C-alpha cells in the first residue's frame, strides 16, 4: 500500500507543471493587446515609451532593459502588469 501511494505521489509530481512562468503583454504601440509567457528565468515585465517623428511609441515585453536617455522604462513583477 505504501509503495502504491509513493508511486502515485511521484507520478503526480512528474505530471504536474510545478514551475511558474511570468506572463507579460508584448504588443507594440497601437497593436491589438497580446501576451507571452516569459522564459523560465525572467522575473520582470517592461513597458518602454519614447517619442519620435510619429508621436509616442510603446514597446512591451519580458525582462527589464537598461535605462536609456529620453526613453521611459517601467519594470514590474506580476502577470500582465505592463499594460
Swiss-Prot record:
**N-terminal signal peptide:** 1-21
Annotated control of activity: In vitro, its neurotoxicity is neutralized by both the specific Chinese N.atra monovalent antivenom and, interestingly, the Australian polyvalent snake antivenom.
**Location of this chain's protein in the cell:** Secreted
Domain of life of the source: Eukaryota
Function text:
Strong post-synaptic neurotoxin that probably binds to muscle nicotinic acetylcholine receptor (nAChR) and inhibits acetylcholine from binding to the receptor, thereby impairing neuromuscular transmission. Abolishes in vitro indirect twitches in a concentration- and time-dependent manner and abolishes contractile responses to exogenous acetylcholine and carbachol. Its inhibitory effects on nerve-mediated twitches are not reversed by repeat washing, suggesting relatively strong binding of the toxin at the skeletal nAChR.
Key word Secreted present? yes
What Pfam family is a match for this entry? Toxin_cobra-type
Cross-referenced SUPFAM superfamilies, in alphabetical order?
Answer: Snake toxin-like (SSF57302)
Note from the entry: Accounts for approximately 9% of N.atra crude venom.
Q: Which GO terms describe its cellular component?
A: extracellular region
Which protein family is named in the record?
Answer: Belongs to the three-finger toxin family. Short-chain subfamily. Type I alpha-neurotoxin sub-subfamily.
CDD domains the record matches: TFP_snake_toxin
Q: Name one GO molecular function term.
A: acetylcholine receptor inhibitor activity
Tissue specificity here reads: Expressed by the venom gland.
Q: Any idea what this protein is called? A: Alpha-elapitoxin-Na1a
> What keywords is this UniProt entry annotated with?
Acetylcholine receptor inhibiting toxin, Disulfide bond, Ion channel impairing toxin, Neurotoxin, Postsynaptic neurotoxin, Secreted, Signal, Toxin
- Report the SS bond pairs: 24-45, 38-62, 64-75, 76-81
Amino acid at each position: 500500500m505504501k509503495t502504491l501511494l509513493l508511486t502515485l505521489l511521484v507520478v503526480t509530481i512528474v505530471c504536474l507543471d510545478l514551475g511558474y512562468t511570468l506572463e507579460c503583454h508584448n504588443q507594440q504601440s497601437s497593436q491589438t493587446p497580446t501576451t507571452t509567457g516569459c522564459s523560465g528565468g525572467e522575473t520582470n515585465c517592461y513597458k518602454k515609451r519614447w517619442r519620435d517623428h510619429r508621436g509616442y511609441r510603446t514597446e512591451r515585453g519580458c525582462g527589464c532593459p537598461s535605462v536609456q536617455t529620453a526613453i521611459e522604462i517601467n519594470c514590474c513583477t506580476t502577470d500582465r502588469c505592463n499594460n
